[in-house]
From Swiss-Prot:
The gene is TEX38. It holds the Pfam family THEG4. This is Testis-expressed protein 38. It is a single-pass membrane protein. InterPro entries: TEX38 (IPR031677). It comes from Homo sapiens.
Length: 206
């Protein structure tokens, strides 16, 4: 009797153990799925933040160069934008771009001395300020491909050398072009020529 009861309890223990292991595996699988989904969302947010930073750096314009740099950095390659040194603005350029300042500086010396003698207590003149301020020049990136240059045709063929569309065409005003005698063979003309040719006897018949 005791052995039979032990045999009945033994399969029930294995069944409970089986369902327990199955539940544990399902819990572990669900936890892994939730973790991978959370990690995927986290990476998506990081990529979106990086894209926002790239767009802000590119001043909201699509830049193939920035896209190329980001692509290289993703694969572990170092890349940077080489803009080169900024061009320095020379004095001659400022003088050419601000001609009003030159007109203000061209003051006769005698007039200035006379004004100082007449007004000894006059205040010192304020330094001249240019009316226009030069904006910082940005270096322009030159493309490696040359720009296409389209040249016009130096001359066009005269209308006289072109065949007329009509007898009185607009292309020939006032009949300036010479008339051309073109022989057009019609069926009637060919029939008349054939008749005249048959009417003449051959020399052998004579």
């Amino acid at each position: 009797m005791d052995s039979q009861q032990e045999d009945l309890r033994f399969p029930g223990m294995w069944v409970s153990l089986y369902f327990g292991i199955l539940g544990l595996c399902s819990v572990i699988t669900g936890g892994c799925i939730i973790f991978l989904h959370w990690r995927k969302n986290l990476r998506r947010e990081e990529h979106a933040q990086q894209w926002v930073e790239v767009m802000r750096a590119a001043t909201f314009t699509y830049s193939p160069l920035l896209y190329w740099i980001n692509k290289r950095r993703r694969y572990g390659m170092n890349a940077a934008i080489n803009t080169g040194p900024a061009p320095a603005v020379t004095k001659t350029e400022t003088e050419v771009q601000n001609p009003d300042v030159l007109w203000d500086l061209d003051i006769p010396e005698g007039r200035s001395h006379a004004d100082q003698d007449s007004n000894p207590k006059a205040e010192a003149p304020a330094p001249l300020q240019p009316a226009l301020q030069l904006a910082p020049q940005q270096p322009q990136a030159r493309s490696p491909f040359p720009l296409p240059i389209f040249q016009e045709v130096p001359f066009a063929p005269p209308l006289c050398n072109l065949p007329p569309l009509l007898n009185h065409s607009v292309s020939y005003p006032l009949a300036t072009c010479p008339e051309r005698n073109v022989l057009f063979h019609s069926l009637l003309n060919l029939a008349q020529e054939d008749h005249s040719f048959n009417a003449k006897p051959f020399p052998s018949e004579l």
